[in-house]
Amino acid sequence: MKKRVVIVVGVLVLLIVLLTLIICFKPREVKDLNLAENIAMKIKEGSLTNTGATVIITDLSGNENLDLINKKFKIDYKKNNKWYRLESKIKNEVIVSTSDNDVDNGNNTYTQEINWERYYGKLDKGHYRIVKEVKTDLYIAAEFDI
């Protein structure tokens, strides 16, 4: 009888651990982004690799309260027509950021180099987007394929 109780408790503990792991490592679906109007971000032709890219940001909004060349970015990936946040390889890393290689090209156009290898490693083949927050809950994004 005692042996049976130990087995049942062991199985229950194992199930709880497995459920916890499944919940913790389930990809986080991303809600719809509130995209900024009259601001475009695109990948500069010839710059895309599986470790980074150069983006060109064009601002025709006239809104001076936006932080267009902030260093923060996130990468999402698309699977089954849903977007999921790519998790950083660096434990407890909340903010991922670019290098200081950003240039004001004039005419409300900015160029920024983004190297995501430190945070995400080399990206596998798939459909992705770079997401930058330009104001609280206001975003710009550029989709790309590796």
Task: Enumerate the language-model features and the residues they cover.
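Positively charged n-region of N-terminal signal peptides that target proteins for export
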Residues: 1-4
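Primarily secretory-pathway and cell-envelope proteins
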Residues: 7-8, 12-90, 133-146
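Sequence-level detector for tyrosine residue identity
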Residues: 77, 84, 110, 119-120, ...
